[in-house]
């Protein structure tokens, strides 16, 4: 019987083409980083938001690639492999959430952030939207971004380290440092433009990989009959409603709630050239997402038949895609498929690093230096932004040094944190004139606290009653909505300018 490490080491050691393909991929990213650096004007908005000049197709794939991360290629197939088709509920929830996000959040956010003081970060938008003169809302929301995104970013570094450990038999820490070096390089120098272009490039690679692997796997197994074989091995494998409890299904489906408040995703809407381009972006983005997620599910299902057929001992389900790509393909193609995993991982890391850097620079450093200095010392602020990328990356690497957690748990905690803190607030800010600063702060903080308390003290009680195992975004989101609404009703109403701005945003969005 082959062990995963033996099978992969034999192939990689014998075929240097795999290493060449990875090296070429890294070289392309470095070139894009230089291109972004050459295009930069020394303006903070250019570095952090691409000067709001990004087209619909780059917007669509960069949003998708930065969203899906290594989770789509490593964790989702592994989850389907372990539990069967019932794991697909998360893909349904995510696709629905992303689709609604394009309609409900994207157009208004693009228009409103420019109208409200040309805000380039979410905390800056909240401040301008609610006339937060003492910056309490801006500071708290900025802190939430820095804390949760550092956690989120470290999950990407964990994925990178695990990839090199599994595929090449290299030390986990070496892989972590290598991935970190490349992604820091093009993010540090190229800024938002480089990150967006690399995300587009990486999104294409990811899509090809997620279509190619399950098709070739079926060709090498029993064709479409592979799914019959999978069902014969265990009937629940192809049952959407078996293998998980009702609470489990609801928890997976509820991931879609998080989309409205994920800064690294909705910043894509802020950077597009015009809100009128969003329908094109939506059509491409949702199509890309649907095909990619279905491909990931297909990898997991075919893997159920593939592993015993090839006598492979799969020690970690999250490495299923790696094993299949190395066993089924020529090393050159295998290198391309490993590059797809790196693409998924690095696209998310770079986006998260840049958003966190934006928050540190725009939401904190600007408070120290002052608004006037920010206007007259743009190059200084760009340099602070670059240094912030480096600092956040170093902290995330330090946390990722101990990889004792699953990718989904790491991502799930951060996703829930943003979903409960920001999703209700973003929706209220874009649609409700009655939102107050006190309501916004209270709702945001209560959502984050509920998520933290649920993870730390409630979830461990799941063995007593499964309701305690509910995904933390649900109670966090509900509490945040209630607190935001109640506190806003009880506190001083904002000025008339809010209703005027909301009406103006609505009218602009309706323009054809």
From Swiss-Prot:
**UniProt KW Transmembrane helix keyword:** yes
Q: Which CDD domains match?
A: SLC5sbd_PutP (cd11475)
Give an example GO biological process: proline transport
Please give the InterPro entries that the UniProt record associates with this protein: Na/Glc_symporter_sf, Na/Pro_symporter, Na/solute_symporter, Sodium:Solute_Symporter
Kindly give the membrane topology term recorded for this protein: Multi-pass membrane protein
Please name the Gene3D superfamilies in this protein's record.
Sodium/glucose cotransporter (1.20.1730.10)
Q: What role is this protein assigned?
A: Catalyzes the sodium-dependent uptake of extracellular L-proline. Since most S.aureus strains are L-proline auxotrophs, this transporter may aid the bacterial persistence during an infection of tissues with low proline concentrations.
| NCBIfam families assigned to the protein according to its UniProt record, in alphabetical order | Na_Pro_sym (TIGR02121), sss (TIGR00813)
Q: What is this protein called?
A: Sodium/proline symporter
Q: Which organism is it from?
A: Staphylococcus aureus (strain Newman)
Its gene? Answer: putP
